[in-house]
Amino acid sequence: MSELIQNVKASFEQVLGYAPSHIIQAPGRVNLIGEHTDYNDGFVLPCAINYQTVVAAAKREDNIVRVVSVDYGNAVDEFDITQAITFQQDKMWANYIRGVVKCLLARGYQFTGADISVSGNVPQGAGLSSSAALEVVIGQTFKVLFNLEISQAEIALNGQQAENEFVGCNCGIMDQMISAEGRENHAMLLDCRSLETEAVSMPEDMAVVIINSNKKRGLVDSEYNTRRQQCEEAARIFGVKALRDVTIEQFNEKVAELDEMVAKRARHVITENDRTVEAAQALRAHDMKRMGELMAESHASMRDDFEITVKEIDTLVEIVKEVIGDQGGVRMTGGGFGGCIVALVPPALVDDVKAEVEAKYQAATGLKESIYVCQAQNGAGLVEVL
């Protein structure tokens, strides 16, 4: 993170002409288990990772917000918080920031303008929530600069609202919540219905290894929407608000009445919810053998029932599983049809995992992977006062 801090400080001074007063960060995240459960009111188990979005900031006495984006060649966006805050077609990055500020104002928070320089190293397009980290770090920045009475959960909800309503992208609450509330060496069990969170301790030093298949994700939006509709149809047939409310026993009693495809989709969600709650218990007990079994079952369910994995992802999972055996776990993570796998790997096996993947994945698929070795990190907060 030190390089990011240097970059935002330098660009702040270079473009805005004076030194910032505060450094703030918010992390990206990876979901350990609980896939496609969020929009079914279910459970997820993500952790924050040591890839962050970092802001250098200072407050202004007037109502102008100026933002410098280091990652877009020091591009600048400027707006007045007393005027209508509008969507920028030609500066997509700026809309996340505008949206967060607009939503904070709509929630009744009072503040003046600010100068902000922002940069991140959360890999974009890998499904590690670079956009949520940006939304959360901006909310955190206004909290810090103006001593706003806003909880971490509300910073997360405000970010989600900005993404849904201002940017116009549908997302659940998981990404913002873990970025805002993560804890070092812990995962977070999140109930997507009540928004209750619970910190779940992880074995000390356990590496969180994320491997991007670099498979271009086609069809992901249309397939995602289809899965969502199938889950809603299943919930309707069971007469419940969401599949969260169906037990596996109830499912088995009624499975014959369901369309075969709808049944497969529903079975994934119902069993995945149970697995996620049990995974939190296994992780807390540092029972990596059981955690590994649950992650393997999750992957098989995504592959066979939810049908969202692809050959490249299955290949990566098999390569990693051979190395870690029952000392850790591995599965696809994210929406599917490409993207990443996540593995919980004992530190002593990290180099072996990397070596095996580098030796076998490209040979099998023709694609070159990207490997990120992470640790579970703290969520958003103040890094330093300058």
UniProtKB/Swiss-Prot annotation:
This is Galactokinase. ATP binds at residues 69, 125-131. Keywords: ATP-binding, Carbohydrate metabolism, Cytoplasm, Galactose metabolism, Kinase, Magnesium, Metal-binding, Nucleotide-binding, Transferase. Belongs to the GHMP kinase family. GalK subfamily. PROSITE patterns: GALACTOKINASE, GHMP_KINASES_ATP. InterPro entries: Galactokinase, Galactokinase_bac, Galactokinase_CS, GalKase_N, GHMP_kinase_C_dom, GHMP_kinase_C_sf, GHMP_kinase_N_dom, GHMP_knse_ATP-bd_CS. GO terms for molecular function: ATP binding; galactokinase activity; magnesium ion binding. It is an enzyme of class 2 (transferase). Pfam families: GalKase_gal_bdg, GHMP_kinases_C, GHMP_kinases_N. GO terms for biological process: galactose metabolic process. Pathway: Carbohydrate metabolism; galactose metabolism. Mg(2+) binds at residues 131, 163. Substrate binds at residues 35-38, 224. Its EC number is 2.7.1.6. It catalyses: alpha-D-galactose + ATP = alpha-D-galactose 1-phosphate + ADP + H(+). Catalyzes the transfer of the gamma-phosphate of ATP to D-galactose to form alpha-D-galactose-1-phosphate (Gal-1-P). It comes from Vibrio parahaemolyticus serotype O3:K6 (strain RIMD 2210633). Coiled coil: none annotated. The record marks 29 as: Transition state stabilizer. It is found in: Cytoplasm. One of its GO terms (cellular component) is cytosol. The active site is at residue 175.
